[in-house]
Amino acid sequence: MRNQDRPEHQTRGVLPTRLAAAGIAALMLSLAARASAEALGPPEKEDLKLGFIKLTDMAPLAIAYEKGFFEDEDLFVTLEAQANWKVLLDRVIDGQLDGAHMLAGQPLAATIGFGTEAPIVTPLSMDLNGNAITVSNAVWEQMKPHVPKMADGRPEHPIKADALKPVVESFKAAGKPFKMGMVFPVSTHNYELRYWLAAGGLNPGYYAPHKNDTDGQIDADVLLSVTPPPQMPATMESGTIDGYCVGEPWNQQAVFMGIGVPVITDHEIWPYNPEKVFGMTAAFVEANPNTAVRIVKAMLRAAKWLDENDNANRAEAVKILSRPNYVGADEAVIAASMTGTFEYEKGDSRDVPDFNVFFRHNASYPYYSDAVWYLTQMRRWGQIAEPKSDDWYMETAKQVYRPDLYRLAAESLIADGLMEASDFPDFDTETGFKPTQTGFIDGIDYDGTRPNAYLEQFSIGLKGDKQL
């Protein structure tokens, strides 16, 4: 899948005419941005192969391709769907792919050596939110008596795992394991599912890589296992799993098939949580710094396009994503979450305008605090087997997350007249750490500058000097 002809875009290198009247401060900022942009040379590598998994949050790649944003940067890109997250990561590491749509935990895990070890970096967050937890119809019927109701009789959201706990206990009493699927051991889905379960008093199990135990089921009340995203509905329908956590469109697919009910979105577990990132090897970035920045430029334009004017472009995006070479699901299924609504029980569609966020709320910025959160969850569930200092968390985050590349891309776009300084964080004051984050389903606040103190707040999970 590759464009053959370069589109005739005429906007590159043109500063908005209103800049002349903008005032001293704005002028100085623009001049600095222009200097940065002029320092950005031609791409070291023009022909690129980028990977993705068939999920709606690969959208920035599809839009950057379809709208000619890659070619505006003299990049000629082939987008290639991958079978699963492991294959995708391995192909980036061995150079078959130049970069890819990745789980936020993948660059971190690869860098610290959980799983395949290789230095991977990310200069861009691809989206916020976008996942949900779905259970089978049979499980939902057993959960419903434990779910509070609104005045109109519909379930009150968010639905906590407290309502699932009696169901899990009934399975245990009958001698049956309760099984749920997630997409990869270092996926947001794994950590969100574990977070939700633990908040409801259910232990999702521990990993012990130092004992060669990478199943993550030690002491588990609920057995979690890996299933590729497109296979989730069929795997649940067959009875192999009783529920799952996945990105779209595979929760809405269960509703359309009439086989399951999404009970909670990840926005209800952790509002505006970081989801996917764009990952490349550190070696690729070192050898091709201009190429890396130009990739980020194209994807930033795509991310803004997806969110601008209150999601006005989402209907067009849905049509693009429904093509078989991208997500390949029915338009109606993709639109169910991409256009500002989300269907829980069949017929119970509710407004969820921020189910997918690609650009607003600084969604694309690679915050160190996001990286630290993922690392805390790796420690909490044993993927990081031994205690780590706060400094270790900070140093690892800064090794993997590359806001310096993001800034170069943003300043170049500003100089090109394609975006405004107001589209981005204030780079002169941005620390990379968000203010203390609230709204988690368990009521625990997160301060990314104090990872060990954060871990101490959990009743279920490893913390302090505890090891398996």
Predicted feature residues:
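Short, glycine-/small- and polar/acidic-enriched structural segments
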Residues: 38-219, 223-225, 237-238, 242-255, ...
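Sec/Tat signal peptide C-region and signal peptidase I cleavage site
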Residues: 33-37
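Secondary-structure end/capping motifs
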Residues: 287-404
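Bacterial N-terminal signal peptides
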Residues: 20-31
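Conserved C-terminal helix/tail region of periplasmic/extracytoplasmic solute-binding proteins
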Residues: 372-468
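Short glycine- and hydrophobic/aromatic-rich loop-to-beta-strand nucleating segment
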Residues: 133-134, 277-280, 284-285
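N-terminal export leaders
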Residues: 9-21
